[in-house]
């Protein structure tokens, strides 16, 4: 299935929101529920894009490594 612009935008918003949360509160203190709540989406909606919190973190790190 082809990724839509909305899906790409949602994935990007999840990464940005998670990065801000991780920077402010620390990785261990942040939950998937908090990230989803900040975005106004359900955990189920977030899990459609990323497997878990570690998957989100790994995508953030990969982006940073790309420059």
Annotate each predicted stretch with a short phrase.
Residues 58-64:
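Alpha-helical DNA-contacting segments of helix-turn-helix folds
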Residues 44:
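Key DNA-contact positions within bacterial/archaeal DNA-binding proteins
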Residues 1-25, 29-41, 51-58:
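Basic, helix-initiating cap at the start of DNA-binding domains
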């Amino acid at each position: 299935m082809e990724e839509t612009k909305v899906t790409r935008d949602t994935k990007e918003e999840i990464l940005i929101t998670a990065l801000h949360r991780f920077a402010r509160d620390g990785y261990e203190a942040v939950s998937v529920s908090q990230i989803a709540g900040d975005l106004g989406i359900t955990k189920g909606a977030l899990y459609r894009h990323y497997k878990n919190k570690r998957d989100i973190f790994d995508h953030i790190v990969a982006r940073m490594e790309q420059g």
